[in-house]
């Protein structure tokens, strides 16, 4: 986040500064300014983060059915009316056996277990 605004950029274009409050490195990038780059083949469970055209941050974890990076990118990019998430930019985190998530928001609770022991994660808390 820079000045309270989330963004996704290339590592070579990133530079630490006082107005950066949080940064994570991951990849590959799935959607870059509305375009999908060439991505590796192969299906797996996936974890990703995207930023919609109106600045909302979406954390995504697939469950049940493995998916290719290309299909994940397509679903993150396309419109809500087409069943997508309308992300202008998105990137993948580690997937496969380490894909997992936990969320508890009011009366909603979600727990997706992975097969691998995870020592690092990304946490989101209310202000």
Named regions from a protein language model:
Residues 1-127:
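Gly/Ser/Thr/Pro-rich low-complexity, intrinsically disordered segments
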């Amino acid at each position: 986040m820079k000045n309270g605004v989330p963004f996704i950029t290339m590592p070579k274009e990133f530079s630490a500064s006082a107005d950066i409050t949080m940064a994570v490195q991951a990849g590959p990038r799935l959607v870059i300014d509305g375009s999908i780059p060439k991505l590796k083949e192969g299906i797996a469970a996936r974890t990703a983060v995207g930023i919609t055209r109106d600045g909302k941050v979406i954390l995504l974890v697939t469950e049940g059915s493995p998916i290719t990076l290309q299909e994940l990118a397509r679903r993150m990019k396309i419109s809500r009316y087409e069943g997508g998430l309308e992300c202008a930019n998105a990137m993948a985190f580690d997937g496969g056996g380490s894909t997992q998530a936990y969320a508890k928001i009011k009366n909603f609770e979600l727990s997706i277990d992975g097969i691998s022991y995870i020592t690092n994660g990304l946490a989101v808390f209310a202000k």
